């Protein structure tokens, strides 16, 4: 089950119904100009923030709009001009993560503090809300339009529904890096550099063969961690990646013993909202009788789940969740105000921990 990262296919767009005679839509302008709907929205709204758009592309969009007789919906314009000082926060969970032990809770602390500082109230949505992410169809996220803009949390936000909000010009920010949909604003942590630093620490202890355990999805946060893992090993050793949709089932004590027999001396797990990879690694190591760091070193690319915080502190890094929440609100407030919206990647903090040490036999050399 050692695999290379897989590239994601970009989703297509459904064609507009044939024979329509009503007001031309942005989708038709996009087809005629040969660009995405998000690009049309940004050009027609004369928004300069977000992805750079060349003057040639702007010219094509404006010419296509003129030739089709496109006129912006005046009702939509009036709605865009109305502000009520409400920011939405949408969590793709069944209930809102207000438990202090939930991994999202520190994000929400930063969101609440920054929103209060800027004079905004918050309206909270969850995946089980009426009209929320659990609904089907083009209006799955429609209720967030009650707010001036919305911040989204979660690894598995629906691309199509988010894309519809972006195309409509509704201010949206995703907490965590996102490649899709086009034009979506996001804030994120620098997981590449953080993962590279953790691997560099292990290499400095003498480890040359490592395995990364990650869940089998394509979340950008996982991709960034894997990239940092690979970059950290480029000049010093060899690494492989174990991907599983169910790490607690597939990462067995026998598998760990085989890796150790093959010369692997360090195991690295990614952090996710489920904590599945780290849970599986800890359990398998304990069941295999592996004592860390005497027999092998363990590292976690993130922080352990709250229910596992009583064990030895893992080598790894801490994510600045409160700072990320505040950065997301700053970006969203800028979008609502029609201003430039940029936020740098936020650096993580290396954590030496107590689960790493020199590889077995290193003291003999």
Language-model regions, residue ranges each:
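Structural signal for hydrophobic
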Residues: 87, 172, 229, 295-296, ...
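Flexible loop/turn connectors
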Residues: 5, 257-365
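An alpha-beta-alpha
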Residues: 196-240, 342-357
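Residue-level detector of anion-binding/catalytic polar loops
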Residues: 71, 117-121, 171, 208, ...
């Amino acid at each position: 089950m050692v695999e290379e990262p897989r590239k994601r296919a970009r989703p297509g767009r459904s064609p507009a119904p044939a024979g329509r005679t009503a007001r031309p839509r942005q989708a038709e302008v996009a087809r005629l100009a040969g660009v995405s709907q998000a690009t049309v929205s940004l050009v027609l709204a004369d928004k300069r923030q977000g992805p750079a758009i060349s003057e040639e592309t702007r010219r094509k969009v404006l010419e296509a709009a003129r030739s089709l007789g496109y006129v912006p919906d005046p009702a939509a314009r009036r709605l865009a001009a109305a502000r009520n000082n409400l920011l939405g926060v949408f969590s793709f969970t069944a209930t809102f993560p207000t438990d202090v032990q939930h991994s999202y809770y520190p994000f929400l602390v930063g969101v609440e503090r920054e929103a209060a500082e800027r004079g905004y109230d918050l309206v909270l949505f969850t995946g089980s809300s009426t009209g929320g992410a659990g609904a089907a169809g083009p209006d799955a996220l429609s209720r967030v339009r009650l707010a001036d803009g919305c911040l989204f949390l979660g690894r598995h936000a629906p691309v199509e529904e988010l894309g519809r909000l972006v195309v409509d010009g509704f201010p949206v920010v995703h907490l965590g890096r996102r490649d899709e949909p086009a034009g979506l604003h996001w804030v994120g942590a620098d997981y590449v550099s953080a993962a590279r630093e953790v691997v560099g620490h292990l290499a400095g202890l003498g480890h040359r063969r490592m395995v990364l355990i990650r869940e089998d999805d394509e979340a950008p946060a996982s991709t960034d961690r894997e990239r940092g893992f690979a970059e950290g090993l480029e000049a010093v050793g060899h690494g492989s990646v174990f991907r599983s949709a169910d790490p607690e089932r597939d990462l067995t004590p026998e598998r760990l013993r085989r890796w150790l027999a093959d010369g692997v001396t360090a195991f690295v797990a990614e952090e996710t909202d489920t904590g599945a990879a780290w849970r599986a690694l800890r359990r398998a190591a304990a069941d295999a009788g592996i004592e860390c760091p005497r027999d092998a070193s363990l590292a976690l690319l993130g922080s352990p789940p709250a229910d596992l915080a009583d064990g030895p502190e893992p080598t790894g890094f801490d994510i600045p969740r409160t700072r990320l929440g505040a950065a997301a609100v700053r970006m969203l407030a800028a979008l609502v105000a029609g201003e430039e919206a940029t936020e740098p990647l936020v650096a993580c903090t290396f954590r030496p921990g107590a689960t790493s040490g020199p590889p077995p036999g290193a003291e003999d050399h």
